Structures are given as structure tokens and as C-alpha cells.
Amino acid sequence: LVVGAVIGGIVAMRVEMTGMPQLVAALHSFVGLAAVFIGINSDIVPPEGLAGAEKIIHEVEIFVGVFIGAITFTGSVVAYGKLSGVLDGKPLTLPGRNLLNVGMVLISLYLGYLYMGHAGSWTLWVMTAIAFIFGLHMVLAIGGADMPVVVSMLNSYSGWAAAATGFLLGNDLLIVTGALVGASGAILSYIMCKAMNRNFISVIFGGWGTTTGPQIEVEGEMIATDVTTVSSDLKEANDIIIVPGYGMAVAQAQSAVSELTRRLRGMGKQVRFAIHPVAGRLPGHMNVLLAEAKVPYDIVLEMDEINDDFPNTDTVI
């Protein structure tokens, strides 16, 4: 425990805020791998005295824990690769990918039936391999723009993996905390998909049920600007909304934005921040950056709180 805590503390302190999404994905992978190891260990060395219904329940706990854990592990590894730039952020679209996903799930369920029918541990090992491949394929098929949802989704999976492990070990605390993490991650993923006008099932299965429709024509005219023009607009504006995105994190510009906000407010102008649910690379990314730069919390608003104010705003950055 001490060694792990020290290593984790050192890694967390050395990681910059721009690398936090990758760290979160890596930590999710550890939870999934731990669930796989614990489940397989419990199969190799089962508790004594189990028979009848108790034995079947124990086998279900092993199977579910290993299945979710394996998906979480490989999915998180791919998410880490995409977020860090090691892997291409474009979705991998294999022919018949949806049928492939369904096939892997059905085969895993059949192997679970065989496993509980005392067919042997080989069914668990084969299912583990399939779940590893399923996790890889599922996240590889999701594009980089949906990565915030993927991180939240993997957070949910890691929670359910922990809960399944809690049932396996008879640990009530692990069950409760895992269920809380799993449920909150699932709800957050749904909220983020709704904010993106995306279908939740479509995102997590890498385009399930989506079709390519006619391209929407952009209305209006795009006008280029420069620093001088923006500075002049800000001086003349009384009501200003700043909408931060991942570019602020990459440029580490949160302190400069905070200083700009301080000066504008000192001139008597109203400055507020509008936070989109999927801004950045993980949930709450922009909120953490702005808090780090000491931007007042009361002017940082969620999309639903400020969306109706845009038509009456003088300038939006």
C-alpha cells in the first residue's frame, strides 16, 4: 500500500494538467486489470465449502468481474494511446464492426453458460481473450472528438468492475464505492452525449446505428479577426462570455485568461465563462484549469445556465 501510494503520488505530481486525461485513462486500466487478476485467481483457488447455488453465484461473480475488467483494461489502454497521440485519433471502421461486437458478446455469454456448466477453466480464459479484443475494438472504433465520453464511460466500467470484485471478495465497501462510480460515470456519459446531440449507444459502440446523411450547409459568413480587433471589441463591450476549450489547456493559457478576466472586470465589465460538458479531454477539465488559475467560481457557468444569454451578449471569445 505504501509503495503504491508513493508511486501514485509522484506520478500525479509530475503530470501536467494537459496530461491529466491520459493519467485518468491509465488508472482506469489498472482497475480493470486488477479485476481480471482477482477473478482468475479466485477461479484457480476457489473458496472451500461452496456447493449448489452458492457455487453458481460465485462463478457468475468471477465471470462478470473478469469480463468487465478485461474490457476496461484494453479499452483504457487504447484511450491512453489516443489521448497521448501514440495512436491515431481517427475511428477504426472495420467492415461489419457492429456484427463483430455482437458476435463477441454472444460468444462470451455462451462461454459463461459452459463455465457454469463445469466445462472447465478454459472457457474463462477464452472469454478473457475475447473481452480483451472487444475492449480494443470498441474504443478503436470511437473518434477522438468523443474521447471525453470514452473517459467517462471507462470510469463507469471501472466502477462496475470494482463492484463485481467486491461481490467476489465479500467486501461491502468495494461494492458500494464501485456501484457509485459505475452509476455516476454512466449518468455523466449520458449527459455529455445529450449535450453533443449524439446517441449514447452510437458513441460507445463506435457508430452503431448511424448513417451518413446529407451535409448541412453552413449559414452566414466567416470573418477573420486579429488581436487588435479583438482588443477593440473587448474595450467596447460591457457583457463578455469566454468559452474555453482544449486549446487553452494545450497552450497553458489559463493564467493569461484569468489575468484578462481580472482586468476586464476591473474596468466594470461583466465577464462570465461558459463551460460545455465535453470541453477538454475529460469531464470537468476546463473547471479544474480555471480554478487553478484562480478564476472566481461564481462566474464559471454550465451550458444550461448561460446558453440563453448569448443573443444578448456583446462579445464572445
What are the language-model segments listed below?
Residues I10-P21, V36-A53, H118-A119:
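Transmembrane alpha-helix boundary signature
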Residues I57-F67, T123-M127, L169-G185:
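Loop-to-transmembrane alpha-helix initiation sites
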Residues V218-V316:
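Structured cytosolic domains appended to multi-pass membrane proteins
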Residues V3-G4, G8, A12, F30-A35, ...:
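Alpha-helical transmembrane segments in multi-pass membrane proteins
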